[in-house]
Amino acid sequence: MLSDKKTETNIGTKKTVLFIAEAVTLAHFGRMMTLARALDPAQYRIVVASDPRYLHLEQPFPFEFESIWTIPGSQFSQSLAQGKVVFDTKTLAHYVEDDLQLLATVKPDLVVGDFRLSLAISAPLTAVPYASVVNAYWSPFAKITYPVPDLPFTRILGLTLGQKIFNAVRPFAFALHARPLNTLRRRHGLAPIGNDLRKVYTWADHTLYADIPELIPCEKLPVNHHYLGPVQWSTNTALPTWWDQFPRGKPIIFASPGSSGQDDLLPRVIEALSGLPVTLIAASAGRSDTSKLETPSNVFVSDYLPIKTAIRNSQLIICNGGSLSTYEALTAGVPVLGFTNNLDQQLNMQAVERINAGIAIRTGSTSIAQIKQAINTLLNTTRYQAAAQGAADVLSHYDGEKTFRDIVQKILL
């Protein structure tokens, strides 16, 4: 009887789950791919929608794909660096129009979004249940402090005075960044979410935190807010030809600026490591022309590397401080050196530093000497390795994909 019931469900009433990634960074696309894979295609029709800029990293593509427009990653990074509103009303209106067309075409039973803020309008307008994947440090319920980002005024006034000013103006800045979505919700007859960027980032029927409470604690969470645990992803790319040749007798360091790191990060890391007794394996993630990089004999570079494989062969990871890379490192028990250049990365690395599993450096004030010192500290101080291994032990108890499957099943019952 159970077998007959399952067959009938698969043929006649298979639910459609639509995943929408805001591809301003690779992490948002990657997390949607991981969660899409977590579902059984025999039980669900799975559709992924994204700007196609990262599609080449997931070939052959395993699901139905719908192309949508996303602002360029360079525009996103520049707005963050200048403290400007990232998604203005005009951009969000364009997104909502695209969303509505997409939802009408796919007809999903559930839409899962990663940083697609316009779904806070398009999903309720079409009465489609909406689950948002977001980091817990953006939750209004997170028990955290907010470091001042690297903004033009902090480069002039310094961090101490800049932090005091940021503490005073942050609520007003968060309200300013929340205004476009609230304006557009009113225009569509929906109530405003509130004058707080954190509420805008986390509004959904179901809010799913791609974090663990041991790293990013929250208090008094609403019943529709859930910790998933880390959502990890790696490029579906082949290992480079040099993979079997690089020396493994010295400490191995993996470095990648990611899609949102600064363009000069990898060249500076290479310069810092050129004279050290280490081996560097690196992925430019498209941020540098690898053919033009000066690579000493202890440096091996490719455009992309499977991050899971690279990290599990390394004693240290150097990255932009984003959660996708740091969770992969901590899962493997590897300490992190994070070069942060926006508030998202700083909030994530603040948590990593709090548990002594890594060191954060602001990219706007980094010398080669500082990079060398941080690398030596992380490689030669046992407390960082012990803390990273402790984090790995905690993370081993989490299964974000299973938790997601269970939540989807409850939503679609």
Give each language-model segment a name.
Residues 131-217:
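Active-site-proximal region of nucleotide-activated glycan assembly enzymes
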Residues 16-17, 207, 253:
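Conserved hydrophobic helix-helix packing surfaces used for dimerization/oligomerization
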Residues 22, 51, 210-212, 257-259:
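Structural motif
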Residues 13, 36, 214-316:
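Donor-nucleotide binding loops and adjacent catalytic segments primarily
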Residues 55, 117-118, 137-139, 213-215, ...:
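Short, solvent-exposed loop/turn segments at secondary-structure junctions
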